[in-house]
Amino acid sequence: MSESLKIIFAGTPDFAARHLDALLSSGHQVVGVFTQPDRPAGRGNRVTASPVKQLAAQHNIPVFQPESLRSEENQQKVAALNADVMVVVAYGLILPKLVLEMPRHGCINVHGSLLPRWRGAAPIQRSLWAGDAETGVTIMQMDIGLDTGDMLHKLSCPIEAADTSATLYDKLADLGPAGLLTTLAQLADGSARPQVQDESLVSYAEKLSKEEARLDWSLSAQQLERCIRAFNPWPISYFVIDEQPVKVWKASVLPAVNGHQPGEILQANKQGIQVVTADGVLNIEELQPAGKKAMKAQDLLNSRREWFTPGNIIA
């Protein structure tokens, strides 16, 4: 392979851990790992180390967990590692300009979209909700802006009709490490050719909110079906009926019908609960009432058929 690089890795969730795992098998030297402090997680709310920390510990790599990289003390920890490059994947902390410039090759980031489309916090979900035909990963040189740095490498993949944020996350977590290793090889041998992002093509992927997850029947059935897939596995799309939230895990789109208003229940049977939208009918196939597990529409109808009487309106 080309020159072995001394790498600092900064990341936190499983998505990042998959990239660290690829680096550990690559012949490069990971000299230190930065990750978020241990935090409560899971049903028991027990304090848990991040997937990246757990993997680093298995390989006896020094781990640093600062609350911020703005202090001189923490910046000195970065400098002391004397790295050639810092690889940042879903880390969760802002890197000050001083830190960005410390390694010989600076800091590079793996971003879950085809930049400059979907800069920001939720590129996977926003690409799904928007109905994009494809997405991918971009490895970029980091600067002080929000995902504004020069692009070093891109890999794309199609967005399939059944993709959810969970399945797309897995696809990009498989795609990213290959792009990262290619980029590192190009940095090492001097063949990297950074490309400036076209500002006229920029879009922003704002962080998701639970409020956005409420189904709005004034949208089209197609938009709502994409929303359901984009918000799976979090925060899960929902509607409110009888003052109770009901999460929607799966739905399909049926042709439009005349003479009905958005939110009106058209039919409710073993095929699903059919709700009129601004354009088309949303057929809800799998849903989850409060305090229950996800279930097929027919199973909920067995206990709550009165909720879904044809002609009723879901607000």
Swiss-Prot record:
Positions of (6S)-5,6,7,8-tetrahydrofolate binding: S113, L114, L115, P116
EC number(s) from the headed UniProt entry: 2.1.2.9
SUPFAM superfamilies attached to this UniProt entry: FMT C-terminal domain-like (SSF50486), Formyltransferase (SSF53328)
Record keyword Protein biosynthesis present: yes
InterPro entries: Fmt, Formyl_trans_C, Formyl_trans_C_sf, Formyl_transf_N, Formyl_transf_N_sf, Formyl_transferase-like_C_sf, GART_AS, Met-tRNA-FMT_C
Recorded catalytic activity of this chain's protein: L-methionyl-tRNA(fMet) + (6R)-10-formyltetrahydrofolate = N-formyl-L-methionyl-tRNA(fMet) + (6S)-5,6,7,8-tetrahydrofolate + H(+)
Keyword list, A-Z: Protein biosynthesis, Transferase
Molecular functions per Gene Ontology: methionyl-tRNA formyltransferase activity
Record's GO cellular component terms: cytosol
Keyword Protein biosynthesis assigned: yes
Family affiliation: Belongs to the Fmt family.
HAMAP family, A to Z: Formyl_trans
Role played: Attaches a formyl group to the free amino group of methionyl-tRNA(fMet). The formyl group appears to play a dual role in the initiator identity of N-formylmethionyl-tRNA by promoting its recognition by IF2 and preventing the misappropriation of this tRNA by the elongation apparatus.
NCBIfam families per UniProt: fmt
UniProt-recorded name of the protein: Methionyl-tRNA formyltransferase
Lineage: Bacteria, Pseudomonadati, Pseudomonadota, Gammaproteobacteria, Enterobacterales
